[in-house]
């Protein structure tokens, strides 16, 4: 049996741009992609904390160190610059792998800089926000 498991998460990213006229996808700073174990063209779920929208797209790399989180194409209608989003990828694992798997989770501040990372989330924990 295979299981679909949470593979990685970029928590509380700040949307920097929304580009309706681009072909599609989400642009993510390549440094953040590396830290969260997200690959170019990987399917990703976007959860908008501001309006509750949940949708899927694929990832394209943005300039390293830029902090860019840009929703492109039709997805640009579901976010506004400044919105807080959670970006989640999933993997398919056999039962033994799934039982050993620990996702990669990074937490960002308001400028999309990494402030913490984790390998396991616990119910009831409040994530670091990076807000003063």
UniProtKB/Swiss-Prot annotation:
Its cofactor is pyruvate. GO terms for biological process: alanine biosynthetic process; pantothenate biosynthetic process. Is synthesized initially as an inactive proenzyme, which is activated by self-cleavage at a specific serine bond to produce a beta-subunit with a hydroxyl group at its C-terminus and an alpha-subunit with a pyruvoyl group at its N-terminus. GO terms for cellular component: cytosol. Heterooctamer of four alpha and four beta subunits. Catalyzes the pyruvoyl-dependent decarboxylation of aspartate to produce beta-alanine. This is Aspartate 1-decarboxylase. The gene is panD.
């Amino acid at each position: 049996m295979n299981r679909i498991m949470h593979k990685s998460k970029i928590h509380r990213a700040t949307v920097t741009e929304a580009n309706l006229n681009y072909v599609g996808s989400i642009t993510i700073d390549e440094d953040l992609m590396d830290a969260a174990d997200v690959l170019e063209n990987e399917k990703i779920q976007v959860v908008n904390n501001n309006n509750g929208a949940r949708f899927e797209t694929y990832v394209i790399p943005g300039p390293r160190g830029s902090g860019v989180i840009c929703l492109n194409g039709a997805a640009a209608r579901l976010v506004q610059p400044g919105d807080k989003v959670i970006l989640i990828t999933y993997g398919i694992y056999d039962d033994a792998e799934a039982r050993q798997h620990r996702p990669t989770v990074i937490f960002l501040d308001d400028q999309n800089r990494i402030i913490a990372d984790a390998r396991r989330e616990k119910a009831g924990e409040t994530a670091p926000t990076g807000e003063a």
